[in-house]
Design a protein with these regions (language model features):
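Residue-level signal for inorganic ion chemistry
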Residues: 28, 73, 134, 165, ...
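Short loop/edge segments at beta-strand edges and connector loops
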Residues: 84, 169, 190, 307-309
Length: 459
């Protein structure tokens, strides 16, 4: 039986990896430099593609896609030598005379599957980690962002031979064909349903995975919060990419004592950002397609809308919408919204708010607005979540110095900066023993003296 093109591609990458070329630190750095130059050279095309796919302005594209990718590249180039160094560790006395060290080695041929909401950044940032660690890589962008996919294919082709890095475009058929191959590592960003499929396929070959998923990320505002700042930063987090962000504040839990004062401030901040009519705002992103547009519109309960609620299917835009008096049984609380809707739930005690969050799947993010240090400490200690902010939203992921990832239902594994390097490499532990002295304690026959000596060494 003849091999399929995807099978041939995987085989070619295995052969290239076996050559040892990617193990050279200089080669890895050259690859990252080439990628950075290509991104800068294609910046205008990237801007145009993201405008076509999502209606992203050039400013938001640089802030959330191109700029973050370039920053990650710069960070990795500065620190790669340190990340890749052999690390010496202490050796226990029982192993005398010997030395111990760990080395990081690449997995081999990796697969990176990216979503449509940040189609450039969420493909390129994992690629940076894969290349820095010395892997070959097959990239699989989302078919829902075709213009961006096309530009990324041009960038990859300009930088790398396909036996080193290749981009496979297509839809579900191509995704399934890729998952039928044996990879050495799979990195997936997307929804829980497809994440399960990826993990199921990976389990057939015991392939390690990173799953960057999502969930309903709460925003908690207590009575001590700076309400004006909280309103502005919550509006930013919700409106960014029109709410199509895996770490967007999904719903608001607010102290009943300050709810009536806070909501008008939130409405005012939204209007400052997108104007009186967001449907005609040039800075405001649109829904990715009709299917997603209709799904989000279907979550709007007109009886509970206190702000917004209008939509334009022709432009795929939905107004920022606040829904008050929402209950846990409402449709908008049954799934991740992934759009510009904000359900509001008032609480009478922080215990009530924390119980509400903990009775659901672990969120990818949590945001707390509070000036109470004791409450801040309590929330961090009592709620499992991937990552988050105190007195801000979303910006915790905009750094290469902390890992980003989920926990439980919101994902497994993390990346960014050194975490990316570690994710795409295996830590090999080595003990080097001298042959000049060979302690007889461990060898048979065992005696009372050997037993006493072992108890001295191993305690």
């Amino acid at each position: 039986m003849n091999a399929t093109p995807i099978e041939q591609l995987v085989a070619a990458q295995r052969q290239f990896f076996a050559s040892g070329r990617t193990l050279e630190l200089a080669f890895r750095k050259q690859s990252l430099v080439a990628l950075k130059k290509a991104i800068l050279a294609h910046e205008a095309e990237i801007n145009a593609a993201l405008m076509a796919d999502l209606g992203k302005s050039a400013t938001e594209t640089y802030m959330c896609e191109t700029g973050m990718t370039l920053s990650e590249l710069s960070y990795m180039l500065r620190h790669l030598g340190r990340f890749a160094k052999k690390r010496r560790v202490l050796t226990p006395l029982a192993q005398f005379p010997s030395s111990s060290f760990t080395v990081r080695e690449p997995y081999g041929v990796t697969l990176i599957m990216a979503p449509w909401n940040y189609p450039f950044m969420l493909l390129m940032e994992p690629l940076i980690g894969a290349l820095a660690a010395g892997n070959c890589c097959i990239l699989n962008p989302s078919a829902y962002a075709p213009a961006t996919s096309k530009v990324m294919a041009q960038i990859v082709a300009a930088c790398f031979p396909p036996e080193y890095v290749a981009l496979v475009e297509g839809g579900r058929a191509e995704n399934q064909a890729l998952l039928h191959q044996r990879f050495d590592y799979i990195f997936f960003t997307g929804g829980v349903t497809v994440g399960r499929e990826v993990m199921r396929a990976a389990s057939e070959t015991l392939t390690p995975v990173t799953l960057e998923l999502g969930g309903k990320s709460p925003c908690i505002v207590d009575e001590t919060a700076n309400l004006r700042v909280a309103a502005r930063r919550l509006a930013f987090g919700k409106l960014l990419n029109c709410g199509q962000t895996c770490v967007a504040p999904d719903y608001l839990l607010i102290s009943r004592k300050v709810k009536d004062a806070f909501l008008p401030l939130l409405e005012r901040e939204i209007q400052r950002m997108v104007g009186e009519n967001a449907l005609v705002c040039d800075s405001y992103v649109h829904m990715v397609n009709e299917k997603h547009f209709r799904r989000v519109c279907g979550l709007i309960d007109p009886d509970k809308v206190i702000f917004g609620g209008q939509a334009d299917e022709r432009t795929l835009r939905i107004q920022p919408t606040i829904m008050d008096r929402v209950t846990a049984d409402d449709a908008v609380m049954q799934e991740e919204i992934f759009g510009p809707l904000l359900p509001v739930i008032a609480y009478d005690s922080i215990d009530e708010a924390l119980a509400f969050v903990n009775n659901r799947e672990h969120p990818l993010a949590l945001y707390l607005f509070s000036e109470d240090p004791a409450l801040q400490k309590r929330v961090l200690a009592s709620v499992p979540f991937g990552g988050g902010c105190i007195n801000d939203t979303i910006v915790h992921l905009a750094t290469s110095r902390m890992g980003f990832g989920g926990v439980g239902h919101s994902g497994m594994g993390s990346y960014h900066g050194k975490k990316s390097f570690d994710t795409f490499s295996h830590e090999k532990s080595v003990l080097k023993k001298s042959t000049r002295i060979d302690m007889p304690v461990r060898y048979m026959p065992y005696t009372p003296l050997k037993d006493r000596l072992l108890r001295v060494f191993l305690r």
